[in-house]
């Protein structure tokens, strides 16, 4: 098996740069969705019901995208087509979701918001996974630690920017207060800004990154033509998964259980316990919550 050549730091950066935009989108979703549904009239105690569809969609969509991209070879690459498609649809949904209040009637707004949330989570995941796969495809074993460190840095930087967006827009004078049932401009503009950055970051990585052609990929990964076209079902893959897969999977299971509680309830819980209000229209509610989250990051 041939050893993949070392890549320059710039090349490693380019492979993962789109991750910055993806994580901004994820942060906007996780920080603001509960607020959006509460603004539309959802009971704060029932917010978890709205968060059920995204992970259900992810359970179905992510394995399908992974399996399809493993067998996709065209002039645009192997992973890049899914990255572009996922980002493009996620951007469209990000522009539509904060306008759910435009629908007349509580039921219509809720259904639109619910479907938009499911699509947003699904296609953000579709845009995110190819970046992880690109590292495995293109980076040699010696540099993978550096490549994933760059990806982790961009991930955390994007999350921080996404979480702070509504605060920054409020700081420059965009209203964080709106009439009952109306989503504030600070949240709407945050989603617009996140959508713009997501598509720009994705285009940058898509243009800068050139994936290996199939023949070269097979040489570097010691894959035969038969193995490349061989189909393994989900049960077979689980049966032959290494021990580390199950170890990491168990840890991830409990981590993501905690994340879901945090994303669903922490905004309302902090607002209720600190400012004694869960009303989304309360003037100091949401920006104060954001400052409480990120006060450790501020000088």
Predicted regions and their residues:
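C-terminal ends and interior cores of transmembrane alpha-helices
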Residues: 81-107
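Central cavity-lining transmembrane alpha-helices of secondary-active solute carriers
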Residues: 47-72, 85-94, 157-163, 299
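Transmembrane alpha-helical cores of Major Facilitator Superfamily
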Residues: 20, 49-56, 118, 149-157, ...
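Intracellular loop-helix junctions on the cytosolic face of multi-pass helical membrane proteins
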Residues: 1-10, 101, 106-115, 126-127, ...
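Helix-loop boundary and gating motifs at the non-cytosolic
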Residues: 1-57, 246-251, 255-283
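Intracellular helix-loop hinge segments at the cytoplasmic ends of transmembrane helices
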Residues: 35, 132-138, 268
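Juxtamembrane helix-start elements in MFS-like secondary transporters
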Residues: 43-51, 79, 109, 113, ...
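Short helix-loop-helix connector
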Residues: 41-42, 69, 73, 123, ...
């Amino acid at each position: 098996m041939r050893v993949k050549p070392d890549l320059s730091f710039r090349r490693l950066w380019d492979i993962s740069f789109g991750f910055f935009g993806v994580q901004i989108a994820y942060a906007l979703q996780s920080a603001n969705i509960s607020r959006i549904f509460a603004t539309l009239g959802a009971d704060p105690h029932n917010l978890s019901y709205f968060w059920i569809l995204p992970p259900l969609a992810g359970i179905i969509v992510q394995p399908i995208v992974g399996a399809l991209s493993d067998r996709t070879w065209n002039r645009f690459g192997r992973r890049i087509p899914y990255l572009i498609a996922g980002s493009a649809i996620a951007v469209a949904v990000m522009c539509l979701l904060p306008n759910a209040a435009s629908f007349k009637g509580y039921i219509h707004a809720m259904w639109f918001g619910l479907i938009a949330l499911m699509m947003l989570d699904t296609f953000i995941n579709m845009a995110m996974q190819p970046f992880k796969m690109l590292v495995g495809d293109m980076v040699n074993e010696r540099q993978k630690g550096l490549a994933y460190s760059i990806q982790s840095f961009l991930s955390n930087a994007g999350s921080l920017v996404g979480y702070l967006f509504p605060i920054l827009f409020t700081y420059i004078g965009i209203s964080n207060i709106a009439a009952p049932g109306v989503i504030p401009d600070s949240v709407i503009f945050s989603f617009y800004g996140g959508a713009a950055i997501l598509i720009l970051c994705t285009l940058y990585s898509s243009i800068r990154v050139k994936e290996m052609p199939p023949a070269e990929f097979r040489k570097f990964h010691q894959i035969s033509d038969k193995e490349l076209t061989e189909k393994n079902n989900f049960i077979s893959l689980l049966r032959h998964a290494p021990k580390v897969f199950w170890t990491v999977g168990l840890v991830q299971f409990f981590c993501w259980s905690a994340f879901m509680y945090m994303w669903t309830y922490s905004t309302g819980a902090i607002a209720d316990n600190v400012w004694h209000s869960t009303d989304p229209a309360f003037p100091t509610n949401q920006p104060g919550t954001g400052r409480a989250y990120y006060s450790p990051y501020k000088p």
